[in-house]
């Protein structure tokens, strides 16, 4: 059949396929590196660079297998033997429907399944073209079943792996020996899974034809070699690195203790920090470590040399003043301006912001019950330094309290302070930057002397509410510095392989219809017997990477931070188990959802770490989206197909 007259449809298909790949990159790639970014092992820029490499490689080596299922496994293409153009229009409609819904979801920061989109879109155009007889319902049932099997299987595997890691490494008094012994095994397992996948699926692309036992033997051999390399070189290097870090932290702690021992208590309503103005508007003098005064030029230097003020060491790095206190309970960063003041901004995602938010007591009347989201709004609405200072000093913040109230009626603010708060703090203004800095400094000193946490707890506790110790469900496990180093690079490696698996699985969602469209145009028939062209898979990989760079960060926040807190150890288990599930599914040609696998692993590990750590409201929304995506994408596709059949092609 002559297809020259329908070249415009092929060109349109290439354009829409790139947009579809863009939407896949903007939405689904967050599944691969979201946890790595959330745990802090890589920055967003580094994640984009690594994902671009591994997504493209995975799409070329693994994408052809799943593409066949998307092209032929959902509908019966033989029904279009006499209406080839109708099938071409259907493939274009499927890409439009899937792309539109994924772009909308990305704009709304809603993580959805790209597999759901393309399956729903394919069914949508088939229902318009041939009714229900065009759909292979048993194949659809298998695919729908895989949507539930994949999160359960991935979650189970992640949970078992995390329990083992916690039992043999995390809960040990010294996790380093067991962790170093397990590193070769972890690396070997990661390498073996992905080498087997490449050899099993990518061998035909590379011109190789090997039996499965040979592929398994090669994978096992490569994993053993890599494990030996890790044991011989990586483990000793990691041991030295951990020992050096612990020694450095010990030295910093001793330095901090020596500095704090020189602090002379000054009985004053409040103390000014370096960079702030004194009460008489004179500049606060700074002294160097030898006790000599330094001039203004030195006070605003951006060098890395330390300085001491009121007996407390401060270090300047690129104009930022950082507290040297090593316990990490309170910390602040300032930025120097020309007027000599140090200005501080607390961001919503910072640890200090969240720490202060937990310490603020919000008065709730019987007629006003504020949700957690309203608590955040209250903290942002009330002048930041007012709320922060009040939180540190133990002053409950009422919903009607404003910064102007504190300055205009200081006696009213005293009424809001509990009896346990010291007299000096009762007389302290809460609406200035100086008072905020003084409160932070005082709290840091008291924290080093001990008892500050108990003091804060007693000051901020509601007298009408009994104090409850955190239950086992509310406790959240934290990675120590040694564990963080052990799993740091390991999570990066598993995230890279997870991105590799995602490229192999989800490139078919964007390129599967385009491959069908191209093969129909090239061969003039619907059987599509030729192999998937590698250059089309590469084209899809480029589109996915473009979407990641432009819009990917919107959904990374949801997967990496909002659903549950991620640590390097938990992130490793999530990445490895979900990647294993996706790679196995890709090799058997089952289009599972990487979103479902990752969500299942994140929820399972988060639930094991802490019963209250999982955002079940967000999980419910994601679960609902699994059901909404198929019909919505199908409706978009059906609408476009109706335009083709009853308008353009009629």
From Swiss-Prot:
The parts of the chain that form a coiled coil are none
GO biological processes: phosphate ion transmembrane transport; positive regulation of bone mineralization
Q: Name one Pfam family in it.
A: PHO4
Name it: Sodium-dependent phosphate transporter 2
Q: Which family does it belong to?
A: Belongs to the inorganic phosphate transporter (PiT) (TC 2.A.20) family.
Q: Topology versus the membrane, per the UniProt entry?
A: Multi-pass membrane protein
Query: Keywords on this record?
Result: Cell membrane, Glycoprotein, Host cell receptor for virus entry, Host-virus interaction, Ion transport, Membrane, Phosphate transport, Phosphoprotein, Receptor, Sodium, Sodium transport, Symport, Transmembrane, Transmembrane helix, Transport
Taken from the record's topology, the Extracellular segments are: 1-5, 68-83, 131-142, 213, 504-530, 587-593, 643-650
Indicate the transmembrane segments per the record: 6-26, 47-67, 84-104, 110-130, 143-163, 193-212, 214-234, 483-503, 531-551, 572-586, 594-609, 622-642
- Source organism (scientific name): Cricetulus griseus
Q: What GO cellular-component annotations does this UniProt entry give?
A: apical plasma membrane; brush border membrane; plasma membrane
What catalytic reaction does the record list? 2 Na(+)(out) + phosphate(out) = 2 Na(+)(in) + phosphate(in)
The entry's localization annotation reads: Cell membrane; Apical cell membrane
Q: Which residues are glycosylated?
A: 81
Q: How does it assemble?
A: Homodimer.
- GO MF annotation list: sodium:phosphate symporter activity; virus receptor activity
């Amino acid at each position: 059949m002559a297809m020259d007259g329908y070249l415009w449809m092929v060109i349109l298909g290439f354009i829409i396929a790139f947009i579809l790949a863009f939407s896949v990159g903007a939405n689904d790639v967050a599944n691969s590196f979201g946890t790595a970014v959330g745990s802090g092992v890589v920055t967003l820029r580094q994640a984009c660079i690594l994902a671009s490499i591994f997504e493209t490689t995975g799409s070329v080596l693994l994408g052809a297998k799943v593409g066949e299922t998307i092209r032929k496994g959902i509908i019966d293409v033989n029904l279009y033997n006499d209406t080839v153009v109708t099938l071409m229009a259907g493939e274009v409609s499927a890409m439009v429907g899937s792309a539109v819904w994924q772009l909308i979801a990305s704009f709304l920061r809603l993580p959805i399944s790209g597999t759901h989109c393309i399956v729903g879109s394919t069914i949508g155009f088939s229902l318009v073209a041939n009714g229900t007889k065009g759909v292979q319902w048993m194949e659809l049932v298998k695919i729908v079943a895989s949507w539930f099997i994949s999160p359960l299987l991935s979650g189970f595997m992640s949970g078992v792996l995390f329990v083992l890691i916690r039992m043999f490494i995390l809960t040990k008094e010294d996790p380093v020996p067991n962790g170093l012994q397990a590193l070769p095994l972890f690396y070997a397992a990661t390498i073996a899974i992905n080498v087997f996948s490449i050899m099993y699926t990518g061998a035909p692309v590379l011109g190789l034809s090997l039996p499965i036992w040979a592929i398994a033997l090669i994978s096992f051999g490569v994993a053993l070699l890599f494990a030996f390399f890790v044991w011989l070189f990586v483990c000793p290097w990691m041991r030295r690195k951990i020992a050096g870090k612990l020694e450095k932290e010990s030295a910093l702690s001793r330095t901090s203790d020596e500095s704090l021992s020189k602090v002379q208590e000054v009985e004053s309503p409040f103390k000014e920090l370096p960079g702030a103005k004194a009460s008489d508007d004179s500049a606060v003098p700074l002294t160097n470590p030898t006790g000599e005064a330094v001039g203004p030029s030195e006070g605003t230097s951006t060098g890395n040399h330390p300085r001491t003020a009121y007996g407390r060491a401060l270090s300047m790095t690129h104009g930022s003043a950082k507290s040297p206190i090593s316990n990490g309970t309170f910390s602040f960063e300032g930025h120097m301006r020309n007027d000599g003041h140090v200005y501080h901004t607390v961001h919503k995602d910072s640890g200090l912001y969240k720490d202060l938010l937990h310490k603020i007591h919000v008065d709730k009347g019987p007629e006003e019950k504020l949700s957690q989201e309203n608590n955040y709004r209250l903290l942002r609405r009330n002048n930041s330094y007012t709320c922060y200072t009040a939180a540190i000093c133990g002053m409950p913040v009422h919903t009607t309290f404003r910064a102007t109230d504190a300055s205009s009626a200081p006696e009213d603010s005293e009424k809001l302070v509990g009896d346990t708060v010291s007299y000096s703090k009762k007389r302290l203004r809460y609406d200035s930057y100086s008072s905020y800095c003084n409160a932070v400094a005082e709290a840091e000193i008291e924290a080093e002397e001990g008892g500050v946490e108990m003091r804060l707890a007693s000051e901020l506790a509601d007298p009408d509410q009994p104090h409850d110790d955190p239950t086992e469900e509310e406790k959240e496990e934290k990675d120590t510095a040694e564990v963080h180093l052990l799993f740091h690079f390991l999570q990066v490696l598993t995230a890279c392989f997870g991105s590799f698996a995602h490229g192999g699985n989800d490139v078919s969602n964007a390129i599967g219809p385009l491959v069908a469209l191209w093969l129909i145009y090239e061969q003039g028939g619907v059987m599509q017997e030729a192999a998937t062209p590698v250059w089309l898979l590469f084209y899809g990989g480029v589109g996915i990477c473009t979407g990641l760079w432009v819009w990917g960060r919107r959904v990374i926040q949801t997967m990496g931070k909002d659903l549950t807190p991620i640590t390097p150890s938990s992130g490793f288990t999530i990445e490895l188990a979900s990647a294993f599930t996706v790679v196995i599914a890709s090799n058997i040609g089952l289009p599972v959802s990487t979103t479902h696998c990752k969500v299942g692993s994140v929820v399972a590990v988060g639930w094991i770490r802490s019963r209250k750590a999982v955002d079940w409201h967000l999980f419910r929304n994601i679960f609902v989206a699994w059901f909404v995506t198929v019909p919505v994408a199908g409706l978009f596709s059906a609408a476009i197909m109706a335009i083709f059949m009853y308008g353009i092609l009629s």
